[in-house]
């Protein structure tokens, strides 16, 4: 699957909700006084910049495959401390690094566990690999996108995107126990957990808004030159999402399951 394109402004609409898993992930890193920290899939750099406060002696590098995201992240750059660059996690091969963070990015990387040996080899004793991925199993959003995109009306224009999108057993995301096993066999001490965040979202069609800057973007990008078709497609998506996540008087509940893994080299 090709790297998707993201909308930094849309992504930031739910900045607080997206920041919480990042904070929960990085809070479990216990590497003492790291000198080099890499944040893979750094997005607009808002959370990457906070790492400089936690680790004042470290050089922080944020990497993202989206040029739009890196352009947005540059405002958080601090000469000699925090920098950003366009890059692909699949091709990133460090020589040495103290802490590797990959928050909500590896779900887009097929067979990402094959990258772990190289990353672990780059870590010193007590160095850390910390990542978080949305758990696809039992989460209906991606299936709704794929099903509508593959329907007779949209198949010719969106069918290829729907086929390439990870799904069910074909999703790159593995069971949390598999991550523990793989990393333990590489000589890591692993802290892992699986949890669900229940977000209360406001506004009309907030679940579609949440994913408009990320998972829905490949589909809408393909229709961006046809405003009428784009509006029709979004209307179909919105209707399905309202059925799956019905609004309540206080807002719309979005239960979002996530897997967390923090592994330290022994």
Where are each of the predicted segments found?
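Conserved class I S-adenosyl-L-methionine
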Residues: 1-38, 46-50, 69-72
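C-terminal helical/coil "lid" or tail adjacent to the Rossmann-like core of SAM-dependent
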Residues: 3-6, 18, 186, 190-248
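Class I SAM-dependent methyltransferase SAM/SAH-binding core
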Residues: 36-40, 44-92, 114
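A short acidic, Gly/Pro-enriched loop at the edge of an enzyme's catalytic core
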Residues: 90-100
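A short SAM/SAH-binding and catalytic strip from SAM-dependent methyltransferases
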Residues: 99-112, 135
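Helix-to-beta-strand junctions that scaffold the AdoMet/dcAdoMet cofactor pocket
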Residues: 109-110, 123-125
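Conserved catalytic/acceptor-binding region of the Class I
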Residues: 113, 128-203, 226
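Core SAM-dependent methyltransferase catalytic element
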Residues: 259-266
